[in-house]
């Protein structure tokens, strides 16, 4: 039985060591501007006492960009500036992510949809095309399902609403290990505290297909953000409530807005999971981009734009409003 005591001692030592590592991490300082988009000033909007970072630039019909789990608005750096040449583009850091506040919250699907809805109201955004990637795409679909006045149409890029929320574990061995341990009591939080830049980089690489897809410095930025007090707790809470994204799919049948489902052929979702969304969302169009993975706006930005802009133009021919006409003309 001595080996049992030895194992327990090692585990306890590992837990204690993780707390020391976390305490010694240097707390990062928020950037005052985006190196990749200096023309877009960094601003904040407050929702229920929680400050959310966002940027806005461009003139024209409104687009809102929503990122995914454990990332931030910088995920759109390859499409946001291009879109801003034709549209008014907003990109938002979700609560507990990026440089937004990290509140004590449930971090489930309802929470994110509620916060984003209120943020759009505070920003007086109406009739916008909501473009979300992964969980951001799921948020966009749920906003439309709940008939939010802010939603004109939705582009859901690789929406994350399958496999009980465990889809990321399909991306790589490292992601399977790290996120597989997250829900294990004590061990999961210990792994979170021992996070490192190489592991963050490997997990991000599991979401792209092309070798040059990840911009220089992005992994480091996302890793540094993870050193903010409370960040690991927030991500742990989100992972514990992953299943709520798939459960919320029951609301898709209520969507009455135009929807474009855009997938990479190497997304973590399976063919039948994509087909289920196309079936369950009335009138949804499904497109698949070749040789591209989950973080599609980074992996295949030109192809995303090539699918997106013509689709916006089709909104008017399908009986859309004057807003759709403006979208088509601006494209």
Please place each PLM-identified region on the residue numbering:
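Conserved loop-alpha-helix segment in the C-terminal half of the alpha/beta-hydrolase fold
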Residues: 258-292
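Conserved HGGG/HGGXW glycine-rich cap/lid loop of the alpha/beta-hydrolase fold
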Residues: 50, 55-99
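Short N-terminal helix/helix-N-cap motif within the alpha/beta-hydrolase-1
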Residues: 71-81, 99-102, 165, 247, ...
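Conserved hydrolase catalytic core segment
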Residues: 126-169
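Conserved alpha/beta-hydrolase catalytic His-Asp/Glu region
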Residues: 24-26, 166-170, 189-253
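Active-site loop/oxyanion-hole signature of alpha/beta-hydrolase fold enzymes
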Residues: 55, 91-131, 306
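Catalytic active-site module of serine/aspartate enzymes centered on a nucleophile-bearing elbow/loop
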Residues: 282-331
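Alpha/beta-hydrolase fold catalytic core
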Residues: 1-61, 86, 125-126, 313-331
């Amino acid at each position: 039985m001595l080996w049992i005591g030895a194992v327990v001692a090692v585990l306890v030592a590992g837990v204690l060591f993780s707390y020391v590592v976390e305490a010694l991490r240097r707390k990062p300082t928020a950037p005052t501007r985006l190196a990749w988009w200096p023309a877009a000033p960094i601003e904040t909007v407050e929702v229920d006492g929680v400050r959310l970072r966002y940027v806005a630039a461009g003139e024209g019909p409104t687009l809102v960009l929503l990122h995914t789990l454990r990332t931030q608005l910088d995920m759109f750096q390859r499409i946001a500036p291009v879109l801003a040449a034709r549209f008014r583009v907003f990109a938002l850091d979700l609560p507990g992510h990026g440089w937004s506040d990290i509140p004590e919250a449930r971090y489930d699907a309802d929470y994110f949809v509620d916060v984003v809805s209120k943020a759009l109201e505070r920003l007086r955004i109406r009739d916008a095309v909501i473009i979300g990637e992964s969980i951001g795409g799921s948020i966009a679909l749920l906003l439309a399902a709940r008939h939010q006045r802010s939603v004109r149409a939705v582009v859901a890029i690789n929406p994350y609403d399958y496999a009980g929320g465990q889809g990321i574990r399909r991306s790589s061995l490292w992601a399977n290990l790290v996120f597989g341990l997250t829900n294990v009591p004590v061990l999961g939080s210990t792994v979170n505290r021992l996070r490192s830049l190489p592991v963050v980089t490997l997990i991000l690489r599991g979401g792209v297909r092309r070798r040059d897809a990840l911009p220089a410095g992005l992994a480091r930025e996302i890793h540094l953000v993870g050193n903010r007090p409370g960040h690991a707790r927030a991500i742990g809470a989100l992972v514990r409530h992953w299943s709520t994204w798939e459960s919320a799919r029951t609301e898709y049948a209520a969507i009455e807005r135009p929807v474009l489902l855009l997938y990479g052929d190497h997304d973590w979702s399976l063919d039948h999971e994509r087909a289920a969304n196309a079936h369950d969302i009335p009138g949804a169009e499904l497109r698949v981009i070749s040789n591209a993975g989950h973080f599609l706006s980074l992996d295949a930005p030109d192809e995303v734009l090539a699918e997106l802009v013509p689709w916006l133009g089709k909104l008017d021919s399908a009986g859309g409003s004057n807003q759709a006409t403006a979208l088509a003309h601006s494209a």
